[in-house]
A protein has these predicted regions:
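Short helix-initiation/N-cap motifs at beta->coil->alpha
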Residues: 77-90, 131, 148-151, 166-180, ...
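Bacterial lipoprotein signal-peptidase II cleavage site
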Residues: 16-34
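Extracytoplasmic small-molecule ligand-binding "clamshell" domains
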Residues: 30-101
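Flexible hinge/capping segments at coil-to-helix
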Residues: 28-32, 127-144
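Periplasmic-binding protein-like
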Residues: 44, 119-127, 190, 194-235, ...
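Extended ligand-binding regions for polar small-molecule ligands
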Residues: 62-71, 137, 143, 148-150, ...
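A ligand-binding cleft/hinge motif common to bilobed small-molecule-binding domains
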Residues: 102-110, 155-158, 179, 184-211
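Ligand-binding clefts/hinges and TM-proximal coupling segments of bilobed small-molecule sensing domains
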Residues: 22-26, 151-168, 201-209, 232-252
Length: 252
């Protein structure tokens, strides 16, 4: 009987370990010794703002939210999910905050509160070398690749029609279709576009920008205490020059 109980307990322990290992979150120790977690939802397919190297999360947003977690006296717990799942994770309470190179929009404001902006961006167009597309005016009737749920997706759908949209879970998945002529261009935030072009030959960004915007962090409506603290940290990072240092580290 003792042997049966021992075997059963061993099986329970194994199942528990497997369950723990299947999580799509990553806890980053901020050195504070805190046990309470600060869960931040992101989509780590958006360099230089958030991306992964091995099991480590890196990027501008990650460094900022690490500082926020430290100021809160909590451990940062990164929840890596699809971009269009970030706001639902915040509104449902699955995450404390969303940090995913997210643009402030009136539609998103209906679901979440936004921190003060911490950076600005513009949408950029990526085309193949030798493409006849020279500006936004040339996109009518073209097949446009976008990352699903991003402002590039929203703007292009409004301006050029649902029938011309080709959506990808990450913008890098659109590079090969672009080169093969399956789509005519990609539209994504400027620093991400530059990163994509730097890592892939035969493509370029157009000098003409398309839509200016501001990034901020998404927080559940009514959580004024967290919103105030996040704004305080952003202001401090800006006033001390630390925010500029973080950006310079990732934007060359």
């Amino acid at each position: 009987m003792k042997k049966i109980v021992s075997i059963a307990l061993s099986l329970i322990m194994i199942i528990s370990l497997v369950a723990c290992g299947s999580s799509n979150t990553k806890t980053t120790d901020n050195g504070s010794g805190a046990t309470e977690k600060f869960v931040v939802a992101t989509n780590a397919e958006f360099p230089p703002y958030e991306y992964k190297e091995g099991q480590n999360f890196l990027g501008i947003d990650i460094e900022i939210v690490s500082t926020i977690a430290e100021k809160l006296g909590k451990q940062l717990d990164v929840l890596d999910i699809a971009f269009d799942s970030v706001i639902p994770a915040v509104t449902s309470g699955k995450a404390d905050m969303g940090a995913a190179g997210m643009t402030i929009t009136e539609d998103r404001k209906k679901s979440v509160d936004f921190s003060i902006p911490y950076t600005k961006a513009v949408q950029m167009i990526i085309v193949t070398e030798g493409s006849a597309i020279a500006s936004v005016d040339d996109l009518a009737g073209k097949k446009i690749g976008v990352q699903q749920g991003t402002t590039g997706d929203l703007y292009c759908t409004d301006d050029f029609g649902e029938e011309n949209m080709v959506r990808y879970s990450k913008i890098a998945d659109g590079v090969l279709p672009l080169k093969n002529g399956q789509i005519d261009c990609l539209v994504i935030d400027d620093q991400v576009a530059i990163n994509v072009v730097q890592n892939n030959s035969g493509i370029k960004t157009l000098e003409t920008a398309y839509a200016e915007e501001e990034y901020a962090f998404a927080i559940k409506k009514g959580n004024q205490e967290l919103l105030d603290k996040v704004n305080e940290v952003i202001n401090e990072l800006q006033s001390t020059g630390k925010l500029a240092e973080i950006k310079a580290k990732y934007i060359k």
